[in-house]
Amino acid sequence: MVFRSPPTIIYGKGTVTSVGEQAARFGKKAVLVCGKGSLRKSGVLDIIVSSLEKAGVSCAVYDRVGSDPTTSDVDEGAAFAKENGCDVIVAAGGGSPLDAAKGIGMLLTNGGKVTDYEKTAPEKESLPIIAIPTTAGTGSEATRYSVITDTDRNIKMLLSTDGIIPKVAILDFAITKSLPPFMTAATGMDALTHAIESYINVNASPITKMYSLEAIRLISKSLIPAVLDGRNEQAREDMLLAALYAGIAICSAPTALVHSMSRPLGAWFHIPHGLANAMLLSTVMEYNRQSCPEKFRDIAIAMGENVEGLSVRESSIAAVEAIAAIADETGLPKLLSSQGVTEDKIPTLAKDAFAAGSTANNPRVPTVEEIETIYKSIF
């Protein structure tokens, strides 16, 4: 088994101010990749720029990444960074800016367009990336993946290579406290999905399972408190750590059927990734439960469920019910139809999901018809 994680992880309240010192290890001019407004509004952008300047690192801000990074975002970002002579990347925000930054970094050292690397591995490592997550969800600060939307084909491309793992991950839970309840819930359910899918993954190892279970434990304890009170520092700290742990886990034991099914929902109907996962998670887990009930018993225990006296089967059911209960408590929408999904598109969604690489990681390999049935059950 191969285990991967970022070389350097800096953790703690206020650590965002260390970005300048870290960037100076790799270069003299940074491209700061971020979203279209939230980082500036929160004041975090100014903190990052100030830290860079104090360390003698100049900065060009690329703030054009949307909620789902597109091929254009990446190609244009690489051109912007090249024009500005950037030699290090700082990515700050949710999973979208972090994923875009990985694609940008890869193009700066390998050339071409991002679509060139959909099925072809890049020869060179990305430009050094320093990742600063402001949401507790994707764990992109720890992974070898970048999900980019190709709007011409209505698909989400998965880039997968060790060369885009960030060199430094900076985890400052204080900068996540302003995240609104909906985003807290959706990104938190994304992290929970990562943790669960990596644990039941056919490629899971003792190391990845350790990270997965701890992520499940922390999320079960702290997601709802973070949704209800964004200023709850302990909950925010737990969630940011959980997202990191789950990201480390999926870096070596990747996502499975939930992600195969959620990506087409994002590509065709622009449903936020975390929300799509939240709607699918308990239903897909019920589908998977019979294939590895012992692992589901472990999940139930990690979630704090009392399984004493229960059979393995009963314990596995308790796990699925606990997952569904957390999704209910977040208040997130449950039905695909509420997000604009049309029933006539389900066969296309199912074919796209079946063809996705994550499906092969699932403990129970589905048919296209079974995937259609799952979609229809939450329509």
List the predicted regions and their residue ranges.
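Glycine/threonine-rich beta-strand-loop-alpha-helix active-site module
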Residues: S72-A174
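Carboxylate- and glycine-rich phosphate/diphosphate-binding segment that chelates Mg2+/Mn2+
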Residues: Y145-A253
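Short, amphipathic C-terminal "tail helix"
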Residues: T342-F379
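Gly/Pro-rich interdomain helix-loop hinge
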Residues: W268-K345
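Glycine-rich phosphate/pyrophosphate-binding beta-alpha loops
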Residues: G137, L244-N277, A356-A360
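ATP/NTP phosphate-donor binding region
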Residues: M1-V88, L336
